[in-house]
A protein has these predicted regions:
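Single conserved hydrophobic/aromatic residue that forms the stacking wall/gate
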Residues: 235, 239-247
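Conserved phosphate-binding and hydrolysis motifs of nucleotide-dependent enzymes
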Residues: 7-12, 113, 157-162
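Short, glycine/charged-enriched secondary-structure capping and boundary segments
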Residues: 19-21, 43-46, 89-90, 122-126, ...
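Beta1-alpha1 glycine-rich phosphate/pyrophosphate-binding loop at the start
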Residues: 1-73, 77, 166-189
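Rossmann-like dinucleotide-binding cores of NAD(P)H-dependent redox enzymes
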Residues: 59, 152-153, 160-215
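Glycine/Thr-rich phosphate-binding loops of Rossmann-like dinucleotide-binding domains
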Residues: 118-119, 163-164, 247
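FAD-binding core/adjacent interface of flavoenzyme oxidoreductases
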Residues: 1-4, 64-156, 211, 222-238
Length: 247
């Protein structure tokens, strides 16, 4: 039995380990387009904030671990670019060498997780705009903070990871503005809990803008859908961060 798994974060590596426990003789291969595997997404903001000092703590199980413990081959920085379910054939690209090759499977597991929603906003490709989806994103954000010493940040969206980022930015004494398109923060919470959370954040100095969205990102300001602006006190002092699903 040849089992191929696409994705090597939480679901993919868990599926691979379970498959090995069920079958001692199966050939198991995981393809992952990033270079980090089996990491804790919930821990990413706490690396940014310094609560987790060593980023390797987020990735305790590497390629060698899965090979030695489970005899599972993990191919990092390999992207599956097409699947032919009739022929059970995959087309894979090695992102390091640009080599494209075929592989086959008997059983296929899709464990690719979520992808960041990137809205069509002018300026979203600027260097001080970030998404938080994986370990590499966390590295980039932390490096930006340490190198540029920003004093202000904008968080677009009020998902749970965004709030963890908010807490982490407080460790750097960064003033934070939250922009939420809905008429209340944390749309999944009941109104009483959302109001309680909002009041608590406001008391702690967080500025919250509801029922609005970001229309344009410039070097020194953000233009909102209601035509108001969010100013920065110097160039590159905004860190725009989202958790990759909710913008």
């Amino acid at each position: 039995m040849r089992i191929v798994i696409i994705g090597a974060v939480a679901a993919g590596t868990s599926a691979a380990a379970k498959a090995r426990r069920n079958d001692d003789f199966a050939e198991i291969v995981i393809y992952e387009r990033d270079k980090d595997i089996s990491y804790s997404g919930c821990g990413l903001p706490y690396y940014i904030g310094g609560d987790i000092e060593d980023i390797n703590e987020l990735t305790p199980r590497d390629v060698k671990f899965f090979k030695d413990k489970y005899d599972i081959e993990v191919k990092i920085q390999h992207e599956v670019i097409s699947v032919d379910p009739d022929k059970k054939v995959l087309i894979i690209k090695n992102l390091l060498t640009d080599e494209v090759f075929e592989d086959h499977y008997e059983k296929l597991v899709l464990a690719t997780g979520a992808s960041p929603f990137i809205p069509k906003i002018e300026g979203i490709d600027k260097k001080h705009v970030f998404f938080l989806r994986n370990v590499e994103n966390a590295r980039d954000i932390k490096s930006f903070i340490e190198e540029n010493k920003p004093t202000k940040a904008v968080i677009a969206g009020t998902g749970f990871i965004g709030f963890e980022v908010l807490e982490s930015l407080a460790n750097y004494s960064i003033d934070v503005t939250i922009v939420e398109v809905a008429d209340k923060i944390t749309p999944n919470l009941d109104i009483d809990m959302a109001n309680f959370l909002e009041n608590t954040l406001v008391k702690k100095g967080v500025k919250i803008l509801k029922s609005t969205s970001i229309n344009k990102i410039l070097d020194k300001e953000i233009i909102l859908s209601n035509e108001n602006t969010i100013d920065a006190d110097r160039k590159s002092t905004r860190l725009n961060s989202s958790h990759g699903i909710i913008w």
